[in-house]
């Protein structure tokens, strides 16, 4: 969870002069993960929820994600509410990759093409929401509700600012299990975020929490 990152804008050149198209541009933000940039098209990306693509196989569910992986220099794509996070492969040069990403994003959003194969997110081949869950003890239902509310209202908005997301995976014997996605996945500072930031917050408001672990 970082301070607001500097932004840069990539204008659309050589496009038709319709007011909407002529005014469209892609803003970019750095993230705490040096391998990941956050791209903001100035409009909604996901109507609700988020989607994380960690492989070319998963990206087949989305023409845009697939096109980004097809550059050969991308190892992760994440769709947030109003942004797309792209993770570069080891050794990739962002000065060369960034223009390719911006061009693909502009082409997608200007053409208003469907984000997912089939037109929507239903049935796409990405891990479902509950996959990988550790689970909860039914006796802890009230505690779990408090934890989820804190994550939804205090943690996820801050993590989204960094180009990522966080998923609740379970609560067992005082331990909260969370999964990092997008820019936060594989980020060098993700452990510190979990331990110093999120763990401290949850332990402060929910005394039953003793630890937070990555799931």
Positions of predicted regions on the chain:
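Domain-level signature for proteins that mediate thiol-based redox and metal-cofactor handling
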Residues: 3, 10-215
């Amino acid at each position: 969870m970082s301070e607001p990152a500097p932004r840069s804008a990539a204008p659309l050149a050589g496009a038709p002069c319709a007011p909407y198209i002529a005014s469209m541009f892609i803003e970019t933000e750095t993230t705490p993960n040096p391998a990941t940039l956050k791209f903001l098209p100035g409009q909604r990306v996901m109507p609700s929820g988020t989607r994380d693509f960690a492989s070319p196989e998963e990206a087949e569910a989305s023409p845009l994600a697939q096109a980004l992986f097809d550059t050969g220099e991308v190892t992760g794509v994440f769709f947030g509410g109003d942004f797309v996070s792209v993770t570069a492969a080891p050794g990739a040069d962002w000065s060369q990759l960034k223009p390719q990403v911006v061009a693909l994003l502009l082409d997608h959003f200007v053409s208003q093409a469907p984000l997912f194969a089939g037109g929507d997110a239903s049935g796409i081949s990405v891990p479902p929401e509950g996959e990988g869950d550790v689970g909860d003890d039914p006796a802890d239902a009230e505690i779990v509700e408090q934890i989820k509310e804190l994550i939804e209202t205090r943690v996820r908005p801050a993590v989204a600012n960094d180009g990522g997301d966080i998923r609740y995976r379970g609560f067992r014997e005082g331990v909260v299990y969370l999964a990092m996605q997008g820019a936060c996945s594989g980020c060098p500072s993700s452990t510190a975020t979990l331990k110093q930031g999120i763990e401290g917050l949850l332990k402060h408001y929910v005394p039953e929490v003793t630890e937070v672990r990555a799931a």
